[in-house]
Amino acid sequence: MARVADYSIIADGWVVEASQDTISFEVPSTIDAGSRSVLGFMLQVNNLDDTNMTLRLNGQKVWTWQYSEGKRIMFFQEVIGAGILKPGTNVFSFDSSSGDFRFVQLSDIVVWWQANV
């Protein structure tokens, strides 16, 4: 059976942690669950103290990050282990922690996966 790459858009616009930190999205039944996937996203953070950030897919931690104060907008990609992404409904969630003020939002969240055709 041949394999092709495809993707699912989790969110296109900005998703602010304070108002929405969990997003459900669909993956077709043709996904090859034994293959790794790639998660890509824009991250904007404005913080006054060290901030820790965690992203999860289906409850499993897939990315963590920490940095000092400042305001930044960056794009990240992360390879996701095999078996984390599943056919049907999947859940993307994120949270952050800091000792002081922080503003965190993500956009253009996309996951690339392999499908059997």
PLM features: residue spans?
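Beta-strand-rich recognition domains
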Residues: 1-117
